[in-house]
């Protein structure tokens, strides 16, 4: 979500000052275990993990899971930005708290090792080159939307029940009051409503629906930001930056600002495209069908790399998933 703030167009020097208010995590590129072949293949792409934590009000990010996982793919040569949402229940290879690798839900990676572990797991399982992450909780989303004066979204009929069912709980967690949504269609929603809109999934599209709504909110914030005065955006950043954790350095933030004029949003996608959703030993997972083929699809559609051959590491993980689940 910090990427939204970065692209808002805040004053260069003022933003440098505000950046010191971020919850900064120092990392090294070697921490992210990027395959050398992948690094070369994706040299024209900057991938940033945007992670929505399920940490409740008053809780820190450490030990929390990720309710939302979005990879922002920025093509350096064109400025095109694509958002790829990864299903939180995707059955992938992660590291546990003891640094042992195992197959599990990708959402658990953050609980075991924070943003670095999530990015490293995505890199290993999906042949990505992520070395930057932004972590936010639903309070940050709520505060951001409120500071922007609300956003316009199109509420569908199957979303209303979940919104009003989980809205009061979300409002309590983010420190606000929930106003029931009483109609479908385009309408302005406030912070607690937007945070709930991003979280719901039970009867409103499941995990893919949640990822889609998160991308809708990000796009709506972008649209609203383009219509907002700089002075208001400064107030937004002052309020929200302290709630956001990232390893993007101040230099990296300012470099992003300098590239803003060339940025354009392209097509958004949900990953995996083809998967088995069901119980394995009593636990629901989204099992890529197969991991290898889903990597090829991602490279073809997102990176314009037709005929991409996944790394031996990714193929090994794919075979392990097939052997463990029988899904292929």
PLM features per residue range, with description:
Residues 1-2, 9-328:
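Non-catalytic, solvent-exposed segments at the cell envelope interface
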């Amino acid at each position: 979500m910090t990427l939204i703030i970065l692209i808002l167009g805040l004053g260069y020097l003022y933003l440098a000052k505000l950046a010191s208010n971020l919850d900064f995590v120092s990392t090294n590129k070697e921490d992210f275990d990027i395959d050398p072949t992948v690094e070369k293949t994706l040299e024209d792409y900057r991938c940033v993990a945007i992670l929505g934590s399920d940490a409740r009000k008053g809780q820190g990010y450490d030990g929390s899971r990720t309710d939302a996982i979005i990879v922002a793919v920025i093509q350096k040569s064109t400025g095109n930005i694509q958002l790829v949402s990864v299903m939180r229940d995707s059955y992938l290879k992660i590291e546990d708290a003891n640094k042992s690798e195992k197959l599990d839900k990708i959402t658990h990676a953050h609980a075991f090792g924070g943003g670095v572990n999530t990015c490293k797991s995505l890199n290993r399982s999906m042949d990505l080159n992520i070395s930057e992450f932004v972590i936010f909780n639903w309070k940050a989303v709520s505060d951001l939307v409120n500071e922007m004066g609300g956003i316009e979204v199109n509420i569908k009929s199957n979303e209303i029940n979940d919104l009003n069912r989980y809205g009061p709980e979300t409002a309590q967690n983010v420190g606000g009051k929930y106003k029931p949504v009483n109609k479908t269609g385009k309408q302005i929603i406030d912070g607690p409503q937007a945070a709930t809109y991003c979280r719901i999934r039970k009867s409103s599209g499941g995990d893919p629906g949640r990822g889609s709504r998160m991308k809708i909110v990000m796009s709506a914030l972008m649209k609203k930001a383009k219509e907002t005065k700089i002075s208001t955006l400064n107030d937004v950043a002052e309020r929200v930056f302290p709630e956001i954790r990232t390893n993007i350095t101040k230099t990296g933030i300012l470099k992003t600002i300098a590239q803003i004029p060339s940025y354009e949003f392209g097509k958004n996608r949900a990953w995996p495209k083809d998967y088995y959703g069901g119980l394995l030993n009593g636990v629901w997972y989204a099992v890529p069908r197969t991991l290898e083929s889903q990597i090829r699809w991602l490279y073809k559609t997102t990176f314009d790399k037709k005929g991409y051959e996944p790394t031996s590491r990714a193929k090994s993980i794919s075979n392990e998933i097939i052997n463990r689940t029988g899904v292929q």
